[in-house]
Amino acid sequence: MKSIYFNEEKEVKIEEIKEAANGIKEGKLVLFPTETVYGIGANALDTNAVQKIFVAKGRASDNPLIVHISNINMLEQIVENIGEIEKRLINKFWPGPLTIIFNRKSENIIPNSVTAGLNTVGVRMPSNEIARELIELSGVPIAAPSANVSGRPSGTNVQDIIEELDGKVHYIIDGGKTIIGLESTVIRAVSYTHLTLPTNSLV
């Protein structure tokens, strides 16, 4: 398989993003930019599609994936409860490079392949225009780890990763070099006085 390449660096072409979004709905993989690093995305509600991510990256299946959303309605569909402290974090940092750990819905709308069987799920709303448009047009949350073969550096531009991932994903969306160049900060609100906040792209 030869990946379909879209160059959106200078101008976002909505028809091309729509084609890639349709690919997501069909269970295909899309390499796309965020403000942090590039990601390999699949429909987060489709177990078979998610499994393709692990194959493409050579990633262990016990390593959970971050779910990317474009609006709060998507979040409410997949998590059990949004507490007051999470709402404050969302209002302050979303869209942006913050992943928040939530309890996932007991109905397991998000499959175990995304969460590695955990009862929690990491979710973020990217600020990158292309990423948000891709998610919105696909109409589903997108599970997406960093775009690289496991053990290799995360990709901050397509040129760094195209050789190792071309043919492993159906679509490659080139949005130029990412702004931040680090993975998102991951946080879990344990209580109002205790936040788990590692040093990363927010600080």
What name fits each language-model region?
Residues 1-195:
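Active-site-adjacent structural elements in enzyme catalytic cores
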